[in-house]
Amino acid sequence: MNPAFHPSTPFIQEEQTLTRRIFEEKRYTVQGHILPRDAFFPMGKRDWRPTAENAARLISEAETILTEDIPTLLATDYASFRRTGDRTVFDRKYQERRKMCLALALAETLEGKDRFTEKLADVIWAMLEETTWVVPAHLSNPAINRGDPERPVLPYAWKGTADYIDLYAGLSGAVLAVSLYFAGGALDRFSPELRKRTEYELDKRILTPFLDRSTWVASGWQGWDGVHPETQTPANNWAPWITGNILTVAAFCEPSLARREEIVSAALPILDNFTMCYGADGACEEGPSYWAMAPGKLFGACELLYDLSDGYLDLFGDPLIRRMGESETLLSVTRRRFLTYADAFAGLKANVGLLARYGERCRVPQMIAFAADRSADGSGAAQDLYSCWDSPYDWLCNLAWEMPQNVPAYQPPTRVLLEDFELFIAREFAESERGLYLAVKGGHNDTSHNHNDVGAVSVFADGQPILLDAGVGTYTAKTFSPERYTIWNTRSDYHNLPTIRGADQKQGREHRAVGFCAGEDSCSMELREAYGDGAGIKSFRRTAALRGGRVTLTDDISLSDAGEVVFHLLTDTKPTDCAEGSFRLHGRLLTYPAGLTMTVEAVEHSAPETARIPVAWGVPTLWRVNLTSAAAKEHHVTVVIQ
């Protein structure tokens, strides 16, 4: 029977401190509360099984895998990232091995005929023989290259014990742990040595280095009280994501109860380091695409800890955890579009299984209604067999999950204010495909997966983008290098923000909005600091409003010396009906001061970092409208969309 829908009291009004260490607050005692290995079962169910539909899909997937070759990982594949900056050559084949492993293991468990055992043994053996489970894009970390200034092309891990765990090493460990748990008996019939070797590698590559605190400063992802002591970078999605997968290895494979407790005790402060970086509004600064990889991964770790402690470690009622979940639903523009900021992907689909499970556990009805709405019309990712596979415990939960029945209809809010993150959203109607939609972002230019986008606005009309944030493209070596802000989609002049006397916004926490203020239908802020002193800006006040069936964007700029200002507008369609002081986008009229000079350009997207951006928006190219104001000390420009 499907679980019932549970209404709950709205929690948005609850008091909340800004910086919280939730596990520490609750004074949990780990010792004596962690289940031994033989008493732990996925989701607390000894007879865990996927839904009938997913069971059939797993069998079918495994049958297909039987006809396929296991991808070969070559030295030249690993070296390609260092040589060309391309991450996909190695990563695609690497990930395919791990998906094969999971599908074969569960299919063998479901069928029990040894039809998939030998192929599974081959895949596991191939993974065990990999020199390192760390992917080449993360090889530059000092913990794995031992400070080699030349940035090695190939890993050093063959020299001795592993001392670094990245996202993909954690994933690999969890994949093998889950596979061994479910298909261990079949693998033992093939060769008991395979289990022994797998357990040896899991201890060597995952559990032992995790418990060695001497590696933590170099690797950095653990958070260190929220901020890394050397780089001063805050904890991001790596903290809950890797921690959740390490906990999966411990839960399924670690035989010593004392060591299981030690691993959990080490994990809880890391998760607290992550929650310390969230404001009371629960907003994910990394962008909606990273919600599943940040708050979603925290939820997954909490779900595993709940099951591993037989319900003792329970954060599901905490208001911050609930807000972190609900925040994703607040960022939906239409059924098929999320708001893009930071490294958000314009083609993102809602992870309906994760959203609904989060909502059920934390009793947030809005999340369940949102997920059901996206599932019903096919705009969510419910049909993906591998949804959440990069955290295998989450994947198991998703495979066994069914959408609850009799869920009330979802209705988007007409106003959203995330005060700590500084994001204001107004919607003309409580319908996702009707009327005008306005989003305005404040904040600072030093977020995780940062774009220089302080003061950026996004506008939609009847579900169509009028002014947009392009979002993320494809990661390459350049993406996370000093050249990041040479990529156009990260720069302020492609975020509906002006270039002032030739200057655009700068990266850094000091480059931020000041005096962010939101009313019922408008938002304003001072943006001088976002550009820095070199721009010669005395004041730059931006105000955006949605009222009376129109969006009004007003920039008041005062300069120390006369200078030219170019107001940039980014859209997905070429302007039509262009006249002095006006043009149309998707049928909507945009007006601007007639004294400005308008030019239109197709946005270049041939570089590998940006090639997929127009595709995500469903168009051949994006367009940028440039409105140039003559040199002056004072600039007052209002753009109206109606």
Where is each model-derived feature located?
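Long, well-ordered core segments of solenoidal/helical folds
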Residues: 62-73, 120-138, 194-225, 262-282, ...
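Structural helix-adjacent loops and short alpha-helical linkers that scaffold large soluble proteins
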Residues: 108-121, 179-203, 250-268, 305-321, ...
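Solvent-exposed loop and edge beta-strand segments that line ligand/cofactor-binding
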Residues: 29, 34, 85-97, 109, ...
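Extreme N-terminal leader/anchor segments
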Residues: 2-55, 103-109
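Carbohydrate-active enzyme catalytic cores, enriched for enzymes
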Residues: 295-467, 518, 525-526, 614
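Non-membrane alpha-helical segments in proteins
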Residues: 96-110, 122-126, 170-178
